[in-house]
UniProtKB/Swiss-Prot annotation:
Purpose: Core component of nucleosome. Nucleosomes wrap and compact DNA into chromatin, limiting DNA accessibility to the cellular machineries which require DNA as a template. Histones thereby play a central role in transcription regulation, DNA repair, DNA replication and chromosomal stability. DNA accessibility is regulated via a complex set of post-translational modifications of histones, also called histone code, and nucleosome remodeling.
Primary localization: nucleus
Compartments reported by the entry: Nucleus; Chromosome
Protein name per UniProt: Protein H2A.6
Biased composition (Basic residues): 129-148
Gene Ontology molecular function: any one: structural constituent of chromatin
Region (Disordered): 120-148
Keyword field contains DNA-binding: yes
Motif residue range(s): SPKK motif 1: 129-132
Gene field: H2A-3
Length: 148
């Protein structure tokens, strides 16, 4: 007969594997249903949401890894996450209301508070007349004492 009673079972293929994702499609689908966001949840919604979340996570981790490398570190810490998110215009706007614990602050010094000698020195150099060449010394004349 056509039944498979004693045969080997096929290994289950998850929806995450079918979609080529690392994030769990089944778990996200379960959360969507349990959260009562809508009366029904389509079969493609958890796949799409998992793909979006995976993309955002990859983007943040890549930028945080670059920030860690810039600081000569091999481990990503919350400070690197904050620097990555706040220095990226789109992610900064998306996560504008988010506080990252132990992230610190973005370094920023108001331009009014910066010393003016760098700008002042450049202006002084341009207003000064061109420097004259230093006079070269003529060779010493031999005197009676040096002739001996």
């Amino acid at each position: 007969m056509a039944g498979r009673k004693g045969g080997e079972r096929k290994k289950a293929v998850t929806r995450s594997v079918k979609a080529g994702l690392q994030f769990p499609v089944g778990r996200i689908g379960r959360y969507l249903k349990k959260g009562r966001y809508a009366q029904a949840v389509g079969s493609g919604a958890p796949v799409y949401l998992a793909a979006v979340l995976e993309y955002l996570a990859a983007e943040v981790l890549e930028l945080a890894g670059n920030a860690a490398k810039d600081n000569k570190k091999t481990r990503i810490i919350p400070r690197h996450l904050l620097l990555a998110v706040r220095n990226d215009q789109e992610l900064g706007r998306l996560l504008a209301g988010v506080t990252i614990a132990h992230g610190g602050v973005i370094p920023n010094i108001n331009s009014v508070l910066l010393p003016k000698k760098a700008a002042g020195a450049a202006e002084k150099e341009s207003t000064k007349s061109p420097k004259k060449k230093a006079a070269t010394k003529s060779p010493k004349k031999k005197t009676a004492a040096t002739k001996e």
